[in-house]
Amino acid sequence: MASYRLSEQAAEDFESIYIFGLLNFGLRQADIYADGMEARIEQIATQPELYPSIEHVRSGYRLSVYRSHSIYYRLDDCGVVIVRILRSQDVGAALE
């Protein structure tokens, strides 16, 4: 398995997404969505260049869209860093 880590903010984003799903759609759907997002993150770690660069948003960042969320990530010496997992927000401010 390829190496990746979640930033503190991305971990908080993931937890918030799960709680929102749990409260609004129930345990089964929250688990299904979280499992799918984890699979996407593992795919990103394995094939980080599969998804487009978003240099116009932030230098060195890439973007993968999973259903209604955007996964922003970058590469460093240790592998993939998942920076944020966002819905519709001001991306520029959220990535600073």
What are these regions (language model features)?
Residues 69-96:
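Enriched for short, Lys/Arg-rich terminal
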Residues 44-46:
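Short proline/glycine- and basic residue-enriched helix-capping loop/turn segments at helix->loop/beta transitions
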Residues 51-79:
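Basic/aromatic recognition patch in beta-strand/loop cores that engages polyanionic ligands
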Residues 1-32:
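Arg/Lys-rich, positively charged N-terminal/basic patches that mediate binding to nucleic acids
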